[in-house]
């Protein structure tokens, strides 16, 4: 997708005043900015703007910053504020998973991080962010100017220009419409997977919130799509459906939060979340395992499939046929 930095004045790393971690080059630039910031610590503002759908990395980045500032012995010089479009902390675009609200609020209190929810960013200036907290009825609750020396705000996403405005193919934001088989209802030869898929929001919220597309969920989309294309090539109708299950490890630098949502979109069969230092260790182990797997060219080794099956986590729904 496209990163819609241009929808908010002053947002983004290219000509704006905030950083991003959406691309490798953005992350490298953010690292340089952070090193400069540490020479002269000031307030930090991190979060996700209106229309964003990828909230998890904003939480991870916030707590990883907190951990790094403590390691450098300058955390006491840096007030931190988390600004998000979510109606509550831990919503994640999913109306929460398990007790992510309680877990993440507790972590923020423990780490002295203030937060603002149902908040839209009006514009960003050099060292100053203009925001509005919004009431449930859509009226402005409070307007504020947040000073910062370093900021990372995740933007909203939108579809790519070649697809924009194609009736029956995409929604108004340019995301591809699909049915339960990942197939576009109008253009039967078009399948879509990943971030470009159109998923309705969980429900009305004072400030627009998108729905995230997580890694395992996307793998389930890809699995179903590959099998359905194969079926069509054999003259059969598509019948495979991805589970859209979510298995996530959010690393907080020295601890973290893990959650399992089956499926990711409620109502769910499994709705579990937990936290602790074990999540940090598990995330490091998974990253090393995943990189090794990719280098070897293995998408899903048999032992990974066996482990997921043992945990009752699958990529495909069981489809009953006559």
Task: For each feature predicted by the language model, list its residue ranges.
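Rossmann-like NAD(P)H-binding beta-loop-alpha module
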Residues: 23-81
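Short, flexible/disordered intra-domain loops and linkers
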Residues: 58, 90-96, 203-210
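A Rossmann-like FAD-binding core segment of flavoenzymes
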Residues: 66-175, 236-238
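Internal hydrophobic alpha-helix adjacent to the cofactor/substrate pocket in enzyme cavities
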Residues: 216-244
């Amino acid at each position: 997708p496209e990163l819609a930095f241009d929808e908010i004045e002053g947002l983004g790393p290219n000509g704006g005043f905030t950083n991003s971690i959406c691309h490798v080059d953005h992350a490298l630039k953010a690292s340089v900015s952070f090193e400069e910031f540490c020479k002269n610590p000031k307030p930090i503002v991190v979060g996700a703007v209106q229309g964003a759908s990828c909230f998890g990395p904003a939480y991870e980045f916030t707590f990883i910053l907190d951990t790094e500032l403590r390691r450098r012995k300058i955390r006491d010089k840096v007030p931190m504020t988390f600004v998000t479009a979510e109606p509550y902390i831990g919503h994640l675009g999913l109306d929460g998973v398990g007790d992510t609200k309680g877990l993440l609020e507790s972590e923020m209190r423990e780490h002295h991080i203030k937060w603002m929810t149902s908040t839209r960013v009006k514009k960003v200036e050099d060292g100053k962010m203009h925001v509005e907290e919004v009431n449930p009825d859509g009226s402005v609750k409070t307007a504020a100017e947040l000073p910062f020396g370093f900021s990372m705000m995740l933007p909203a996403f939108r579809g790519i220009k070649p697809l924009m405005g194609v009736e029956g193919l995409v929604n108004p934001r340019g995301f591809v419409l699909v049915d339960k088989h990942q197939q576009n209802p109008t253009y039967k030869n078009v399948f879509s997977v990943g971030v470009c898929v159109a998923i309705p929001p969980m429900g009305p919220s004072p400030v627009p919130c998108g729905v995230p597309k997580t890694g395992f969920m996307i793998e389930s989309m890809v699995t179903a799509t590959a099998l359905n294309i194969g079926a069509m090539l054999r003259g059969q109708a598509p019948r495979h459906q991805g589970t859209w299950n979510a298995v996530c490890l959010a690393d907080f630098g020295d601890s973290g939060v893990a959650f399992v949502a089956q499926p990711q979109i409620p109502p769910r069969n499994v709705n579990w979340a937990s936290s602790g230092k074990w999540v940090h260790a598990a995330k490091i182990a998974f990253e090393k395992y995943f990189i090794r797997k990719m280098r070897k060219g293995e998408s899903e080794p048999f032992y990974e499939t066996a482990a997921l099956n043992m945990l009752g986590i699958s990529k495909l729904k069981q489809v009953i046929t006559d």
